[in-house]
From Swiss-Prot:
Belongs to the bacterial ribosomal protein bL27 family. InterPro entries: Ribosomal_bL27, Ribosomal_bL27_CS. This is Large ribosomal subunit protein bL27. The keyword Ribosomal protein applies. It comes from Burkholderia cenocepacia (strain HI2424). Gene3D superfamilies: 2.40.50.100. It comes from the Bacteria. Residues 1-21 are annotated as: Disordered. GO terms for molecular function: structural constituent of ribosome. Keywords: Ribonucleoprotein, Ribosomal protein. The gene is rpmA.
Length: 87
């Protein structure tokens, strides 16, 4: 009788789910207080005026306004700022 031995199982074939990181609201766009601006790993971008940082380094707006991106210092750190909407 013809037989075929069982093949070994592959060690590959897995992949982690994407984390959907990145900029969620771009420069000049309006944002409400509490809205997420950037999801990131580590502080690639830093919180500027009217911007808070979550424990996973997510940047979010503290006030209603418009998002602005800037650089700061000699090492050109990326800064995220929310310019408050006129009251």
């Amino acid at each position: 009788m013809a037989h075929k031995k069982a093949g070994g199982s592959s060690r590959n074939g897995r992949d982690s789910e994407s984390k959907r990181l990145g900029v969620k609201v771009y420069g000049g766009q309006a944002i409400n207080a509490g809205g997420i601006i950037v999801r990131q790993r580590g502080t690639r971008m830093h919180a500027g005026e009217n911007v808070g940082m979550g424990k996973d380094h997510t940047l979010f707006a503290l006030v209603d306004g418009h998002v602005k991106f800037a650089t700061k210092g000699a090492d050109k750190k990326h800064l995220v700022i929310v310019v408050p909407a006129a009251a």
